[in-house]
Amino acid sequence: MEKARIYELAKELNTTSKRLMEKLAEIDISVKNHMSLLEPHELDALYKHIGVIRHDDKKNEVEEKKTVAESTNTTEKKKEVKKEVKKENKNAPRIIRTTEIIIDSSTEDSSGANNFPKNETKNVQKKNYKNNFVKVESSTSGLRPGFVRDVKPDLRNKQNAASSKNEVKKALPKETSAPKEEVLNSKIINEDIHKEEKTVADNKGNGSKVLKGSSNTESAQLNNKVAAVEKEEQKSINKPESAQISTQSENKPQQSNGAKQPEEAVVSVNKDSIGKSEQVTAQNDVPSVNKVHPQEKPVHRTDRPQGQYNNQRSDRPQGQYNNQRSDRPQGQYNNQRSDRPQGQYNNQRSDRPQGQYNNQRSDRPQGQYNNQRSDRPQGQYNNQRSDRPQGQYNNQRSDRPQGQYNNQRSDRPQGQYNNQRSDRPQGQYNNQRSDRPHGQYNNQRSDRPQGQYGNKRPDRPQGQHRQQNLDIPKPDASVAQEAFDSQRNEARREFQGRDFDKNVKREEKQKKEAPKSNTATKQRFRPQKIVIEKKGVSEILSEDYIFNEFYNDDGKKKKHRNKRNDKVQVKYIPPKAVLTSITIPESLTVKDLAESLKKTSTEIIKKLMAYGVMATLNNEVDFETATIIAEEYGVKTEKAIQVSEEDILFDDDEVQDESKLQPRPPVVVVMGHVDHGKTSLLDAIRSEHVIDSEAGGITQHIGAYTVKANDRAITFLDTPGHEAFTAMRARGAQVTDIAILVVAADDGVMPQTIEAINHAKAANVTIIVAINKIDKPSANPDKVKQELTEYGIVAEEWGGDAIMVPVSAKKRENIDQLLEMVLLAADMLELKADPERQAKGTVIEAKLDKERGPVATVLVQRGTLKTGDSLIAGSTFGRIKAMTSDKGHAIKAAGPSIPVEILGMDEVPEAGEVFYAVTEDKVAKHLVEKRKFKQKEQQFKATSKVTLEDLFTQIKEGKVKDLNIIIKADVQGSVEAVKQSLEKLSNDEVRVKTIHGAVGAITESDVTLAQVSNAIIIGFNVRPGANVTEAAKNAEVDMRLYSVIYKAIEDVQAAMNGMLEPTYKEVILGHIEIRQIFKVSGVGTIGGAYVTDGKVQRNSEVRVVREGIVIHEGKLASLKRFKDDVKEVAQGFECGVSIERFNDIKEGDVIEAFVMEEVKR
C-alpha cells in the first residue's frame, strides 16, 4: 500500500483536509499540514476509525477480468456476475454508514416526492397522501462524484427474484390505465396541441372557427400521433439495451426455461419504461456490466389538472400562454376562444369582448386608439361618432362634445384651449362649426361672432377681417380708460367717440347683409391670416393690438399703408449652414473641440462627463474621444494630415541615386557582459590603453573610434557592459552594421550576453562572436559555442552562419583574424552611402566641457558634415565651430561612417538624437523653437491629461510614498542610465521619482530644489563646489556622489527600505493550560494555569484556544506566581493569568503566548 498525502486522501473521502486532520488527531496521529504523507499503517488506522472499507486493487482487477470473460456466457451467468460486481466494483474507499438507506431505483425520483413502498400501487387519486418512510440518504451520499451505491437490502434482491414473473403479468394489463401512460399521453397531447395551436394562431380572424371545426379531426390525429410518438420513445429508450436484447434473442433456442424468464422481464421493463428517465451508473472499469436504472417522472393526475405552460387538457383547464380550450377558458395572449373570452391584444371576439389596440367589435366595446364602433364607442383621435361617445384625444362627438383642434361638431360645442364659460363658448383654432359658432382665440362675446381661420360653413357665416357686416357692440368708455395707459388717454377717447358712431352703422348693415353667401368669406380670409402670421402671440394678446385692430380705423389704414413698405424692407435671411463634418488633429483641447462643433464648452464638458471623463476647458481629448462626442451631434470627423516643417526641410527620401553611392566603412559595435573584455579587446585593436581611465574598470559611456585594417577603415563603438546602460546599448545597435559579441571563454553566456544578442537581433545586424580569454587555463570555447546555440547563434563549423573567432585581448592573439572577419561581413553587406547628400547622423554621446562648452560625439551616417554647417539635433541648434577626429586631430569634413567630436551647439543634445545639417540658420532656429515649445506643451499635457485610468490610478496611489531624486552627471547617457536604474526600484509602496536630471556640476539651485521637494541629490562623476556643500549641509539635504553605478543603486535601495512600513512575523513563545478558575470582584476572571511548553512573558500577546478554535486574541493583563507579579514563567511552572477585556476563561482552555518581531527588508 502506497503512502498518501492528506489533501489527496481528503479528495477521495469527499471531505476537507482540515476535517481529516482532526480525525487523525483523534487517533493520536499528528501531521504538519495538508501536504504531509501518511504511512500505510496510519492509513489503515484512519480507515478503521472512520469506518471505511478499502478494497485490494489487484484483486479487483483480476475479478473484473474474470467478469468480462464470463459476460459472454448465458443470461443466468450474467446475472450472477452482476451481483458479484455490484458488491466489488468500486476501487474508491466507501464510507459505511449505520443509517438505513432505502433505495428503489425503479420508483426513485430525484426530488424524493414520489418514493413509494415496494410492490404497492400508487394511489394517485389521493390528494394528500403521505410516504410510509422517511428517506434519509440518497444513492450517491458520501461517494465521489460519478459513483452510485448499488448495494441494496437483501429483501430487495429476494423480491426481485420472486416477483419478476408477476411484474411482467401485472405490467401488461395495466398498460392502458396506469398513470404513467396517462402522463405520457398528456405529454404527447400537449405537444401536439401546442403545434396545432401555432397554426390556429396564424389564422388571425378565423381562429375560433378553425378550432371548432377541427375538433373532431384533431382527436383522431392526436390518437395517431400518440401511437407514433409511443413507438419512437420506446425505440429511443430501448437503445442502451438493444445489444443485450439482440444477443438474448439469438441464444433463445439454446437457453433453458429459466433463462427466458429474465428476458421477458427485460422486455416488459422496456415496454413499461415509457415516460421514465434512464440513469446509467458510471463504471469505467467494467463497461460491459453497466446498468440502466429507469426512473419515473412526477405523476400528473387526470382529475382537475392544473394547467401549465403549453399544457392543454380537456377538463376544466386553467388557460395559459398559447392555450386554446373549448370549455370555460381564461383568455390569454393571442388566445382565441368562443365562450366568454377575455379579450387581449389583437383579440377579435363576438361575445362581450373587452376591446384592445386595433380592436373592432360590435357589442358594447370600449373604444381605444383608432377604434371605430357603432354602439356606444369611445371616440379617438380624428374619430367621429354619433351616439354618446366618451371623448379622448382629438375626439369629435355630436352630443355635448368638447371642441378640440380641427374638431368639427354641430351641437353646443365647448371650447378647450383658453376656454371660458360653457354658456358663452369660444371657437378654437381652425375650428369650424355651423351652430352658434364663436370667434377664435382672443374671442369676445358670443352675440358678436368673429370669423375664424380657415372657417368655411354655409350656415350663419361669420364676418372676416374688415368685413362690414360685423356686429360690434358699443364700447364702454370707463373700461377703456382703466385698461389703457394714462399717456394715451386723450387719443383713445377720440377713437372711442368715432367708434360709437360707426357701431350704429355697422349694426344696421349687419342686419341687411346677414344672408350673404360663403364666397365672400373665402375671399376675405387671406388678410387675417397674414395679420396673425406677422404678429407674435404676446403682441396679438396685447390691448393695443385689440384696440388698433377692432376699434381704430385709422390704425387699420396706416397698417394697410405700411404693407407696401414692409414688402420692400423684408430682408432675405439665408438658412443656417448645417455642420456635417469637421477636420481635427490627433489631440485637441475641449475648447478647440467646442469651437469646431460650434457648441459651447459647457455642452462638450457635459457630454464628456456622461462618458465618465472629467475634463476642464484646457484638458486635451484624443481623436477617438472627439469622434464619439461629434457623433452625438451628428457630425463626422476627419483626422488632419499634419505636414511638419521638418518633413519639408529634411531630405529623408529613401530612394538614392545608385551612380552617386560610394562604399563606406562598416560601423561595428562591441557588446557583451560585464568584465568579459570588451574594452580590452577594443584597446588591443586600437593598440591604445583606454581602459585605465574607466572607473572601476567599467566603461561608463560610449566611445567611437576608427581603425585601419588592410588599408580599410573600420569604425568601432564601445557600449557599456552594465545592464543599466540598456538604452545606450540599444541606441548603439541601431546605428551599427556589425556587432562583435564578446563572450569570456571561462564564464560562458551571461545575462547581459543574452540581452546583447536580443538587441543585435532586433537591430538586424550581423553578429560576429569573439570568444575572449582563451589564454586562461579554465577556458572552454566549445562550451561557449554550445551555449550560444541555445539562443539561435550557431557556429559555421557546426552548420550555422555565425562567425566565431577565439581571441585573447590580453596577449593580442587572433586580433587580425577578427578584423578580417569584420571586413568579410562588411563586403557581404555591400555597405554604401551618398557623400553628396544632406548630412545626417546620430549623436553618440554629449557632455558639457568646462572649457569648450557643449561637446557632442556624432556619427555621420549619410552625406558629408563640414565645419560651418548649421545642425539641428532634437531641440538643440548650433553652428559647427570645430570638428575633432577620434585621434584628436582637427578636421574640416567628415564623410559617412566617420565619428567626430563637434563644438558649437547651444545646449547639450540628447544622446541618441538624430542630427541634420541645414543650410539656413533662420530656418534651423525656427524649427528648434517650435520643437522646444512642443516639448514644454507635452510636459504640461502629460500632467493635465485626464482619462478614467489615470483618475483611478491617482485614487489608488493615495498611500504611495515618493522618493524624489535629483541626478547630475558628467554626460547625458549617464543621467539616463542612473534614472532608469533607480526607477526600476519602484514598487507598490515606494515610487522613485526623478524630479530633475541634467549634465553638469551640482549647483546651489539644485540644493534649493532638493530642499523644497524633499529630494536626494545623486552626483555621478561630478563634484560640488565648497559653497554647494555648505548650502546642502545648512539645508539638511542628502547629497551623494558616486563614480560607479552599483553603489548608487545599493544606497537608494537602502533609503527605500527605510521608508517601507516594517513587516512583522509571529513568534510563538509557549502554551498555557487553564486548570482552575477564580472570579475576583473588581478584577474579573483569573485563570490558574500550567505552562505546558515554552515560556510566557508578561507583555506577550495571547490567543485563547478552546477545543481547537480561537475564541479571543488579546494581551495579558497580569502574570503572577503566587502573589508576586513576574516578568515571565517558564515551562513546568504554574501561574495565574488574566487577559485584558476578556473574562470568559474556562477550565481546559489553552492560551497560546506569542510576540510580533519586526522583519528586516
Curated annotation (Swiss-Prot):
Residues 672-679 are annotated as: G1. InterPro entries: EF-G-like_DII (IPR053905), IF2_II (IPR044145), IF2_N (IPR006847), P-loop_NTPase (IPR027417), Small_GTP-bd (IPR005225), T_Tr_GTP-bd_dom (IPR000795), TF_IF2_bacterial-like (IPR000178), TIF_IF2 (IPR015760). The keyword Protein biosynthesis applies. Residues 772-775 are annotated as: G4. Pfam families: EF-G_D2 (PF22042), GTP_EFTU (PF00009), IF-2 (PF11987), IF2_N (PF04760). GTP binds at residues 672-679, 718-722, 772-775. One of its GO terms (cellular component) is cytosol. It comes from the Bacteria. Keywords: Cytoplasm, GTP-binding, Initiation factor, Nucleotide-binding, Protein biosynthesis. Belongs to the TRAFAC class translation factor GTPase superfamily. Classic translation factor GTPase family. IF-2 subfamily. This is Translation initiation factor IF-2. The lineage of its organism: Bacteria, Bacillati, Bacillota, Clostridia, Eubacteriales.
